[in-house]
Amino acid sequence: MKIAIAGSGYVGLSLAVLLAQHHEVKVIDVIKDKVESINNRKSPIKDEAIEKYLVEKELNLEASLDPAHVYKDVEYAIIATPTNYDVDLNQFDTSSVEAAIKTCMEYNDTCTIVIKSTIPEGYTKEVREKFNTDRIIFSPEFLRESKALYDNLYPSRIVVGTDLDDSELTKRAWQFADLLKGGAIKEEVPILVVAFNEAEVAKLFSNTYLATRVRYFNEIDTYSEVKGLNPKTIIDIVCYDPRIGSYYNNPSFGYGGYCLPKDTKQLKASFRDVPENLITAVVQSNKTRKDYIAGAILAKQPSVVGIYRLIMKSDSDNFRSSAVKGVMERLDNYGKEIVIYEPTIECDTFMGYRVIKSLDEFKNISDIVVANRMNDDLRDIQEKLYTRDLFGRE
């Protein structure tokens, strides 16, 4: 089967590699370097499984800048373009999704278009009306950055939103779900073909629950530090309850990354006509955590604050909406000199702060080293290290 994918970020590229094991897949992107990288079998993003599969697997995969070449004759066109949160509109910016749909329809008037980008509730119906087509369905992704292909190979569930009253479209939705399952290694995978709105909002609720869990354990940590208690002991006791579990429970400077901040804000906006307290509290409490972390650092009265890594996860190369950036902004408001150690940054400054290339120099000039996640590189400076990482994992 011929499949097109718009976007080569962690969603689009992981799907491309997954499906190219058994199908002819063409990826379109507007960035020439990414296209060349994929065609040279080098991953433009950090993902160990993607890097391995590009080198070791026989993939029927091609990347291109040419939409006519990509969309012609395909049966499915997957839209995996970014939908950042627009604070002025108070919702996702879906312009890239609509641009991709428009381009696809110019070159192919028969394929089924699958939106993989995260979107607001009601958007699929809205965009079907806007483009006067019944060929668009929605399939939420449940992927982790830097582990996107792994999560496609071992999916927790496959969800497709469709018009359940349209038997042909529902058939196409099931077929798309089977395409994803066919590329997976995991054999027993729940498949749920549901209404558009249910699929859309389930994605937002899933990520907001994860954000809530992050905030819960961060509040245990804040309480413990203020009261002089051992947060690890308390978290261990809490998590021995199998209903809670010892996972996703490591304190941090707050939730961040590409998905959780924007998805929680979108869900909060979706609740505008629905009574709620929790969703608003989750969004607000993440700001409170950053305020607290910044205050704890300022209390140590450092002249030079060293920020060790901007990335949210130790195996990631992305620091969009990183929690530590929020802490930096708060410290900057108090006039603190801030230096950064971040090997993924090639320039000498970032956000107006000096980037130190030498780890030894960084340690020497910093009065305090702030690390969202612990690393063995920092074991020799425990006396000036500030981290809330208790377990040495995500």
From Swiss-Prot:
Q: Where does substrate bind?
A: 141-145, 203, 207, 248-252, 256, 313
Picking any one GO molecular function of the record gives: NAD binding
The protein here is known as UDP-glucose 6-dehydrogenase
Query: What's the encoding gene here?
Result: cap3A
- Class of enzymatic activity (EC top level): oxidoreductase
Q: Which family does it belong to?
A: Belongs to the UDP-glucose/GDP-mannose dehydrogenase family.
Query: Binding of NAD(+): at which residues?
Result: 2-19, 29, 34, 83, 118, 145, 258, 262, 320
Q: What does this protein do?
A: Catalyzes the formation of UDP-glucuronic acid which is required for capsular hyaluronic acid synthesis. Directly responsible for the transformation of some unencapsulated serotype-3 SP mutants to the encapsulated phenotype.
Recorded hits in Gene3D superfamilies, A to Z, give: N-(1-d-carboxylethyl)-l-norvaline Dehydrogenase, domain 2 (1.10.1040.10), NAD(P)-binding Rossmann-like Domain (3.40.50.720)
Query: Looking at the record's lineage, which domain of life comes first?
Result: Bacteria
Q: Fetch the Pfam families from UniProt.
A: UDPG_MGDP_dh (PF00984), UDPG_MGDP_dh_C (PF03720), UDPG_MGDP_dh_N (PF03721)
Q: Which InterPro entries match?
A: 6-PGluconate_DH-like_C_sf, 6PGD_dom2, NAD(P)-bd_dom_sf, UDP-Glc/GDP-Man, UDP-Glc/GDP-Man_DH_C, UDP-Glc/GDP-Man_DH_C_sf, UDP-Glc/GDP-Man_DH_dimer, UDP-Glc/GDP-Man_DH_N
